[in-house]
Amino acid sequence: MSALRTHYTDEAEFVRRVDDVQRPEGYRIVGAFEGERCVAVAGFRVIHNLAWGDTLYVDDLSTLPETRGRGYGRALLEWCKEEGRRRGCIQFHLDSGVGPEREEAHRLYFNTGLRIYAYHFAAPLE
């Protein structure tokens, strides 16, 4: 996950944030492994809202750079979709940043059946 969320430089703070804030909101992490080494992770939660209904939302999807292209991201996305079905969700969503460095990820998303259905707008509140 540190390859994706580079602003967390302190491992203990990252773990605290996941355990104390994310997990109580239903956040879970699953991984893909090469032997004993975790090479890809997906962080997800089930959300409920009036616009989408029950939705499995992927907050985080990250594969170590040296293991990209081996199918780990695809496998995790497919697992998450199936988990959403198991939990009775009717939608599967994720947001992705934009820019040339995201093209490989976007290709994966399109190739796994995801489509762009909305713009996600944001502004800092500082």
Q: Which functions belong to the PLM regions below?
A:
Residues 48, 61-68:
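A short, internal acetyl-CoA/4′-phosphopantetheine-binding micro-motif in the GNAT/acyltransferase core
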Residues 80, 84:
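Hydrophobic pocket-lining residues that define ligand/cofactor binding sites across diverse proteins
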Residues 12, 52-55, 70, 88, ...:
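Non-catalytic, surface-exposed connector residues within folded enzymatic/regulatory domains
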Residues 1-53, 77-78, 124:
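Acetyl-CoA-dependent GNAT
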Residues 67, 71-79:
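Conserved acetyl-CoA pyrophosphate-binding loop and the N-cap/start of the following alpha-helix
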Residues 74, 86, 90, 98-119, ...:
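Conserved active-site alpha-helix within GNAT-family acetyltransferase domains
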